[in-house]
Amino acid sequence: DASPVYAPMTGAVPLEDDTPRLVVAMAGRAVHVYDLRALRHAIYSGAPESAFAPAQRRESSLKFMLRDVRCMPDGTGYATSSVEGRIAVEFFDTSAAAQAQKYAFKCHRREVDGVDVVYPIHAMAFHPLYGTFASAGGDAHCALWDPVAKKRIRQYVLPSPLSAACFNATGEVLALASGAVNLEDANHDGPDAGEVGGIGAGGHGHVKLHIKPALEDAKPKAKAR
């Protein structure tokens, strides 16, 4: 059954928002949100430059450089990821009730020789039917998350760092790219070549595409009664 089962946040947060938006991650942890309808009107009406300003200017909840930003399929918000192995889930509605629903969490970390190693989250992708999302990291892991339950649904372990992720339009498959992003120590030959923690080297000759089934893997888990 491929029917949507995504249940957005409850309370005063809108259940759906059909405003066409463009969300841009800027330098300095800034996030600009544009209303595409307003931009279209400004273009065709010959409006002054001030009309092309973002509808919202925000500061990211994450403390370090952003790596990716993705909008929720129901239009109510977006998620950002950072080089510090954290993800933030935020909402366009500026009311206090809606903003109280935003949150951030850490992921894509593991202990290596007694040290907590943090990996960047290079890419994310929202499932078009369920509203769950995937995060692809430099630790060669892809995690599937339920943003409502705030839990991980599933995790894949790939051979080398992940650089891109995308669900197809029907949500049947998840495509992952590995090997294109790697730390500097992966750029040399020898037995020690590879990512921190023994992850396989990226770079030329290691780029691969991985196709994962998504209709069942990305479906939110039913709540226990």
Question: Would you name each region that the model predicts?
Answer:
Residues 1-225:
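WD40-repeat beta-propeller superdomains and closely related acidic/aromatic-rich repeat-like regions
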